[in-house]
């Protein structure tokens, strides 16, 4: 007699790529602390250019992987050439159901700030955003030594701050300061 097999829904693999150590450690800590299921390639987070990010997205899509790409948009504002590349990348993947591009302006620190403060004010640069964040995380530092410890992420997760940040980020979408990291959080929380 033939064995009846149940159809078990398989979950598509989610892979996060990004451009810096802050993003790498943030998502690594979230995975560990909240039990999120995704993969991260640490070597893909160090000084990535837009070209390298795009190449990795294509490779992952060819493997039928859902891709979440996290980066700071201030990089594209520094030169017209970088801005054109970033605009082309966004346009290329804006309607792709297997890619979420999560940029933040000025930087990911704006996303962190939303965990503590309801703000959409314009920040001149990422340093200004970091100064505002230090009002809440006084020891915040972008060094590997600081980032590899998970205390700073634990502090942001306390009191359901991440849900509040998601609501605020969605509310302020398209403003002078914004972060689309809420899309990544929503996806990995499914």
Where are these regions (language model features)?
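Short beta-strand/turn micro-motifs composed of small residues
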Residues: 18, 71
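Eukaryotic endosomal/vacuolar membrane-trafficking regulators centered on PX-domain-mediated PI3P pathways
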Residues: 46-50
